[in-house]
């Protein structure tokens, strides 16, 4: 499952991810289409809190996020192309919590009691809005939601009062039946232990993400007739830099100990007929924390490799982890896919040019972690926004657009070093990057090592980790005036 709500994930990456999944025989990708940040990072103001819905909507013009979205056509094409690779896309519209994108658009359907990220379950307008939204993507001979399953959310709504619990259960049942009315199988997040009540919720032929046993006790859910996807949060949730979940999955533990039959502390027989399989998730909880799609992939890819082994083999792994870990390093992401930006398999100087002419192109689009890029520069007057190199994913500036300093931009984030080359000045520049930092050296001295930065909110009560990494762009040189010589690219950090 990939959270595209809190951070926009470009379609090009989703397409590559499907290719990787197919290569490793993973068959289901749940695409989480809406979500929101946490209001404590936005002045404790719901109106300022980041929220997004990523799909084009003609029913509700203006609902779709302006900082990245998918047209109906490209989402349809994506699902159909994935199906040719035997990967099913399960689109998710998450209601009635995690719904700030919808209440930003239509504030009157937000809950004043439980927060504006909750829909008000007691207002008829809420149902009218959500009914029409789902119908937009379900109706017609060629619906936007192509596959046989649709996820309706139902995650983490308040259970503060019995009457709201019963309303939540009725709401869940309503949207199960709505998507079924269009011939789809409904998928829900496990919440019915947390929302324990009397109102019946359909269980026959319903799939439930079993993520936390306090929200949905898996033994009870199986007894009630639900089919489960094993996705235990403490084991298989990636929440980058958050601190309360894993930043990278504990693959040694997963490889040696976990199977889909392990849902939290509950252990079932292997290949239990009610457990359809396993899944892992990447949640982008901390909207605005500097994460790039490349950083997300750096976490996703090794997890995908290991979960592919475990979901297919269970306990019957054929190699010790140490042997598996060594051998997988030689395997590509997928034919024609290099999201990690790997160049070469052994530590080496992998690319060099005696001079870099403005506008020239490179053999490689980019180099990923770990790397060192160095060059000699003779400075000349440069306009703000002058690029050294760019790729489809990033830009490295000789003079950034704001302050005219050396720096880089990717995924909507601009990071600048406290340095610029003055006209007539000669210097040797070295940039090193790994999955946690980007370092600039000038003439052998560190100017700045951009490590993970702690940002504080609400008088220090709340904090967020901010990352400043860069998969270095190499594809095309900018239109600079300075002279660039002796470009060298190493696929390791030469200072380490």
Could you describe each region identified by the protein language model?
Residues 1-118, 125, 131-149, 284:
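Feature activates predominantly on carbohydrate-active enzymes
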Residues 2, 29-31, 89-93, 148-152, ...:
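Hydrophobic faces of well-ordered beta-strands that scaffold small-molecule active sites
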Residues 10, 38-41, 98-101, 160-162, ...:
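Extracytoplasmic/secreted cell-surface and envelope-processing proteins
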Residues 36-52, 194-201, 448, 454-457:
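Beta-rich nucleic-acid/ligand-interaction surfaces
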Residues 5, 34-38, 94-98, 155-157, ...:
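Active-site beta-loop-alpha junctions enriched in small/polar residues
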Residues 20, 199-206, 213-354:
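Flexible, acidic glycine-rich loops studded with aromatic residues
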Residues 343-496:
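Extracellular glycan-associated modules
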């Amino acid at each position: 499952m990939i959270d595209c709500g809190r951070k926009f994930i470009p379609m090009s990456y989703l397409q590559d991810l499907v290719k990787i999944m197919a290569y490793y025989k993973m068959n289901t990708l749940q695409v989480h289409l809406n979500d929101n940040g946490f209001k404590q990072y936005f002045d404790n103001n719901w109106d300022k809190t980041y929220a997004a819905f990523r799909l084009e909507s003609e029913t509700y013009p203006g609902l779709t996020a302006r900082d990245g979205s998918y047209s109906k056509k490209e989402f349809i094409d994506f699902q159909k192309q994935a199906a040719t690779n035997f990967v099913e896309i399960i689109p998710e519209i998450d209601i009635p919590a995690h719904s700030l994108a919808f209440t930003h658009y239509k504030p009157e359907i937000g809950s004043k009691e439980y927060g504006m990220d909750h829909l008000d379950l007691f207002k008829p307008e809420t149902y009218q809005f959500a009914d029409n939204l789902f119908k937009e993507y379900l109706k017609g001979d060629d619906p936007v939601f192509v596959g046989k399953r649709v996820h309706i959310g139902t995650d983490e709504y308040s259970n503060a009062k019995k009457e709201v619990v019963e309303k939540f259960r009725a709401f869940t049942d309503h949207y199960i039946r709505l998507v079924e009315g269009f011939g789809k199988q409904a998928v829900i997040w496990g919440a019915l232990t947390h929302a324990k009540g009397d109102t019946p919720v359909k269980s026959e032929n319903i799939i439930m993400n079993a993520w936390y046993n306090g929200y949905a006790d898996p033994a009870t859910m199986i007894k009630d007739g639900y089919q489960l996807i094993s996705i235990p949060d403490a084991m298989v949730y990636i929440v980058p830099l958050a601190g309360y979940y894993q930043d990278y999955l504990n693959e040694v533990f997963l490889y040696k100990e976990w199977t889909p039959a392990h849902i939290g502390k509950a252990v079932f027989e292997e290949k239990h007929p009610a457990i359809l399989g396993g899944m892992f998730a990447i949640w982008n909880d901390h909207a605005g924390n500097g994460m790039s799609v490349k950083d997300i992939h750096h976490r996703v890819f090794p997890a995908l490799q290991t979960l592919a082994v475990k979901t297919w083999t269970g306990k019957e792994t054929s190699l010790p982890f140490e042997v598996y870990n060594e051998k997988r390093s030689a395997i590509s992401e997928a034919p024609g896919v290099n999201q990690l930006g790997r160049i070469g398999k052994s530590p080496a100087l992998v690319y060099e040019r005696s001079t870099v002419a403005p506008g020239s192109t490179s053999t490689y689009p980019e180099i990923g972690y770990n790397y060192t890029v160095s060059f000699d520069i003779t400075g000349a007057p440069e306009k703000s926004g002058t690029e050294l190199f760019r790729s489809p994913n990033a830009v490295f500036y000789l003079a950034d657009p704001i302050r005219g300093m050396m720096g880089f931009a990717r995924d909507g984030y601009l990071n600048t070093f406290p340095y610029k080359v003055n006209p007539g000045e000669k210097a040797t520049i070295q940039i090193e990057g790994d999955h946690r930092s980007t370092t600039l050296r000038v003439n052998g001295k560190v100017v700045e090592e951009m490590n993970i930065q702690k940002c504080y909110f609400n008088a220090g009560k709340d904090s967020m980790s901010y990352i400043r990494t860069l998969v270095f762009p190499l594809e095309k040189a900018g239109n600079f005036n300075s002279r660039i010589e002796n470009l060298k690219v190493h696929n390791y950090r030469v200072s380490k």
